[in-house]
Amino acid sequence: EPSAWVGILVMLATGIYMIVQSFRLQLTNADDTRFVVNAVDTVRTNRMLLTDVNTGKEILSWTGDLFKDVISPWAVFAAYLSKITGISAASMMHTFLPPVLLAVMMCIFWLIAGELFDKHIYRSLFVILLLVMYMYGYFSIYNAETFTIIRLWQGKATMAAVGIPALLYAFLRLYRLLPDDRRWKEKTVYNAEQKGAIC
């Protein structure tokens, strides 16, 4: 149907606009430096997270922010991608990961919409609404929308933009695969009543 295709085209245009804006609004600060330095150092030394990003000296014990990096080695994953593709780690994180991760996020939104709506036009409108909310959600530097647009290559932003929606989709999908909810409840209550569990 034509309205579905119009919706899909508007959705794609909105997604492309968001990708362009993510390049324009990129934020590189001390937090970003830590992730990029960890990735570059991992590629350079072939060792994971053993250099203090502030001093350049070897880390003898992990404390504070350094310990946080060890338990969430997203920078090591970026270093791995850098190593197997031959692209520098900084370019991988600032140029290649954002559009790919934004496209993955939009695909997950489309899958969620597929679980919620039958018609393509409603799916498209749902994704457009979410993308617009992400674009206009830039009211604080600490919220998921801002992280998604200005620093998606960082692990916490990827978790908020891709990980949590993917988990939501998995739960929706699993819920759909369950047997009919009403029959399941009736059987459970019936069996419990027979055993005297419910008074």
What are the language-model segments listed below?
Residues 159, 164-195:
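Membrane-interface transmembrane helices that cradle and orient dolichyl/undecaprenyl
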Residues 1-21:
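Start-transfer (signal-anchor) and selected internal transmembrane alpha helices
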Residues 4-8, 121-127, 193-198:
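Membrane-interfacial loop-to-transmembrane alpha-helix junctions, especially the N-terminal start
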Residues 15-137, 141-154, 158, 162:
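Active-site lumenal/periplasmic loops and adjacent helix-entry segments of GT-C-fold
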Residues 1-2, 113-117, 170-179:
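Structural signal for the C-terminal ends of transmembrane alpha-helices
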Residues 63, 150-154, 189-199:
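Glycine-rich, flexible loop segments associated with nucleotide phosphate handling
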